[in-house]
Amino acid sequence: MALKFKFAIASDLHIALPHTIWQHPARFHLVEYSIPAFEEVLSQLATLDLDFLLLPGDLTQHGEPENHQWLSKRLAQLPYPVYVIAGNHDVPRVETFNQFTPHYTQFGFKSGLTEPHKPYYECEVFPNVRLIGLNSNQFDADGQQIGWIDDEQLVWLESVLENQDYALNLVTIHHNVLEHMHDQSRNALGQRYMLGNTERLCKILHQANVKLVFTGHLHVQDIAYSDRYDLYDITTGSLVSYPHPYRVLNYISDESGDRLEIASFRVKSIPEQADLSHFSREWMGDRSHPFVVRLLTHPPLNLSLEFAETLTPELRYFWAHIADGDAQFEFPNFPPVVREYLEAFSDVPPKDNNITLSLNK
């Protein structure tokens, strides 16, 4: 069946009205620019003939009702449909689940009204195309947030995918399903961004021939592929951190086969910050030191703090390079073991920003 549709992705908006901003000297996210950055994206998207916009979670700074209200009102003004899911920042406590979904009944969750307050849904986003929005935000016995899909939701997902009425199923979930950096499921930088029971989810998706998952949370531009599950995990960076990216995607199914054309763009300037790219890269560099030290002093390197500190100046932009996508690293002056480990963070295929993915395997 021939298909052709266009959609955009903007992730981890972290919308924060000025009076709600949490002021902290080590604050990593440029939430004061969340609204102007999003408005710039909407301005650029206004020139396109979009079929829908996808927002894969962390819609707000910390789940503040007034930030959800502002965003839902703004989304309702757009000329194309918008579909959202919850991120960990949107539901910081167990009780906030029931407060989240009512804000977004026009943006995906309306199809779940037979089960009020379920933070997951399915809906048709284009003729013969279904979007499944999953919830990966759970809490452990100590009340700490974890990335996990509960059994009830997985049973629901299997049931939904048994319906073969759609030519294409797309899935969106906040936590990463595949690794987007070296050793992500185990290293000190990336582990908490992974879905804890990703293997079970991937098996379900593979059995249903689902090939495309759209995630957020990590704040990096990356596309990962699993040959085992024939699955792409396309994660998009945050609009409140370098490089302030968004994506425009064209899905095409014709006599040549099925493919997804991906183009990535950046918000480089806003009225409040003329050179946003430079400013935010330096902001990230200024605040990356604790994360780099943690990576160096934790397994598998286990460097002493004293020695790790001697390496950090050359790693000032390490995270910024990863966030930008398609990063390639060389550290010829580092000890061999450290060099080998850090250079393994270089990007591997497929490309992260601009690429056409063939879906015909």
Model segments located where?
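A short C-terminal boundary segment appended to hydrolase-like catalytic domains
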Residues: 255-361
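Beta-strand-turn-beta hairpins that frame and shape the catalytic cleft
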Residues: 1-8, 118, 122-133, 164-168, ...
